[in-house]
From Swiss-Prot:
Its EC number is 5.2.1.8. GO terms for molecular function: cyclosporin A binding; heparan sulfate binding; integrin binding; peptidyl-prolyl cis-trans isomerase activity. Acetylation at Lys-125 markedly inhibits catalysis of cis to trans isomerization. PPIA acetylation also antagonizes the immunosuppressive effects of cyclosporine by inhibiting the sequential steps of cyclosporine binding and calcineurin inhibition. Acetylation at Lys-125 favors the interaction with TARDBP. Binds cyclosporin A (CsA). CsA mediates some of its effects via an inhibitory action on PPIase. GO terms for biological process: activation of protein kinase B activity; apoptotic process; cell adhesion molecule production; cellular response to oxidative stress; endothelial cell activation; leukocyte chemotaxis; negative regulation of oxidative stress-induced intrinsic apoptotic signaling pathway; negative regulation of protein K48-linked ubiquitination. It comes from the Eukaryota. It comes from Felis catus (Cat). The modification Phosphothreonine is found at residue 93. It catalyses: [protein]-peptidylproline (omega=180) = [protein]-peptidylproline (omega=0). The keyword Glycosyltransferase does not apply. Residues 7-163 form the PPIase cyclophilin-type domain. This is Peptidyl-prolyl cis-trans isomerase A. One of its GO terms (cellular component) is extracellular region. The gene is PPIA. Catalyzes the cis-trans isomerization of proline imidic peptide bonds in oligopeptides. Exerts a strong chemotactic effect on leukocytes partly through activation of one of its membrane receptors BSG/CD147, initiating a signaling cascade that culminates in MAPK/ERK activation. Activates endothelial cells (ECs) in a proinflammatory manner by stimulating activation of NF-kappa-B and ERK, JNK and p38 MAP-kinases and by inducing expression of adhesion molecules including SELE and VCAM1.
């Protein structure tokens, strides 16, 4: 089985910043990877296109995926509002790791984060399901618009997204 690759075209206050592509580990976490893939294509009628990264903490991570409330309190999965933690096989080993944000055990929706550092304290709590393939420089550029409390100085959006 070939793992899917998806892309985000990132914009800052509406101006193009660049493309980030992700390898999704469907061989290890098929349900979680499929959720992210389908939300990236928008094939279920909803998804990431036009949504923002509402929380960016330099030296930690960039969080997005709340396409319903745009502030970190919303989002939904392709399986319903929430779905269970699939497994914790993959670890938060360093920059570029793609992992599910949650509000405790078995509360995965659509929110995710891209690590910009090793975050081993999240192992066993958040499901890792992908990795930046290309465009880590774009993720690093996004980081510059973040702050210690996560508030962004400019609006960082997913202007377009899909599967490669």
């Amino acid at each position: 089985m070939v793992n899917p690759i998806v892309f985000f075209d990132i914009a800052v206050d509406g101006e193009p910043l660049g493309r980030v592509s992700f390898d999704l580990f469907a061989d290890k976490v098929p349900k979680t990877a499929e959720n992210f893939r389908a939300l990236s294509t928008g094939e279920k009628g909803f998804g990431y296109k036009g949504s923002c990264f509402h929380r960016i903490i330099p030296g930690f991570m960039c969080q997005g995926g709340d396409f319903t409330r745009h502030n970190g309190t919303g989002g939904k999965s392709i399986y319903g509002e929430k779905f269970d933690d699939e497994n914790f096989i993959l670890k938060h080993t360093g920059p570029g790791i793609l992992s599910m944000a949650n509000a405790g055990p078995n509360t995965n929706g659509s929110q995710f984060f891209i690590c910009t550092a090793k975050t081993e304290w999240l192992d066993g709590k958040h499901v890792v399901f992908g990795m930046v393939k290309e465009g880590m420089n774009i993720v690093e550029a996004m980081e510059r618009f973040g702050s210690r409390n996560g508030k962004t100085s400019k609006k960082i959006t997913i202007a377009d997204c899909g599967q490669i």
